[in-house]
Amino acid sequence: MAKNAIVGQSGGPTSVINASLAGVYESCKRRGAGKVYGMLHGVAGLLERRTCVLDDKLKTALDIELLKRTPSSYLGSCRYKLPDWHTAEGETVYVQLFEILKELDIGYFFYIGGNDSMDTIGKLADYGAHIGSDIRFMGVPKTIDNDLMVTDHTPGYGSAAKYIGVVMKEIIRDATVYGTKYVTIVEIMGRNAGWLTAAAALAKAEDCEGVDMICLPEVPFNVDHFVEKVERMQKEKPSIVIAVSEGVKLEDGRYVCELADDVHAVDAFGHKALTGTARFLANTVARLSLIHISEPTR
């Protein structure tokens, strides 16, 4: 009798994460898997035995095609960090998970997500090997940040990059409409990888001169040099548009956003929420009187 498969989605959603889910489902059925289960809200939901049978949801080819074009995470997501299974307390979580997988007669485990989700898959695979489990654990790449190792371009990045290019072009149009001095700083996602921020360059075309500056987390950031560069640019043109990554770091390794007074929350994986980079830089530029903002007369 064929083993069953189970698939989950984790981390932030993308425009195409459900296309990956559809691909996993179709591949499992084509290769002879039994039932295909879905985890509701990732491993966090699985620990609470919250699952569904995807065979009951995806009954026709049209259902699958619609799933491919449905944004966000169809199964729901989570940000749950599995503990270290080498500790007695941590191992109880794995024992519980593998008991649930045994009850469902799972032979194939798929997890769609980014780096943190791959961390989850790695831990489950290691523990499975430790206890001699024959379950195959497979990670399915998904991240708009495009920062997964040995992956040239991750599903989700292309859609996000295109979106950023379009939005930046619209912002550039708006910023130049009044003919007054403006500095527009756009903060873009990207903790340690600048692929998304670099996509702001896509705004440049025959009908648009593009952004004036792109600041990436891979390049050490100097606030004084940034202000000086803005000042030089404003002597040449009144309106400047800058794309800056949320994760730009100072030369000493601190995030620029840490210079602000904002409170930064931390998620289950210990990642600090990086917000306020653009606000801090905008306030710094404004404080030095390099920017003049006027309201249009209606």
Regions found by a protein language model. Name each.
Residues 291-297:
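Residue-level detector of conserved catalytic or cofactor/ligand-binding positions
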Residues 100, 108-113, 119-134, 154-290:
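Accessory alpha-helical/coil subdomains and C-terminal extensions
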Residues 3-7, 68-83, 142-152, 179-182, ...:
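Gly-rich Lys/Arg/Thr-decorated short loops/hinges at beta-loop-alpha junctions or inter-strand turns
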Residues 25-61, 122, 126-173:
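Glycine/threonine-rich beta-strand-loop-alpha-helix active-site module
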Residues 4-12, 74-78, 107-113, 139, ...:
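Short glycine-rich or small-residue beta-strand-to-loop segments that form or flank ligand, phosphate
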Residues 10-12, 39-45, 79-80, 114-115, ...:
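Short, ordered loop/turn segments at secondary-structure junctions
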Residues 14-24, 46-47, 92-95, 115-123, ...:
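Short glycine/serine/threonine-rich phosphate/pyrophosphate-binding segments
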Residues 28-104:
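Glycine-rich nucleotide/cofactor/substrate-binding loop typically near the N-terminus or early
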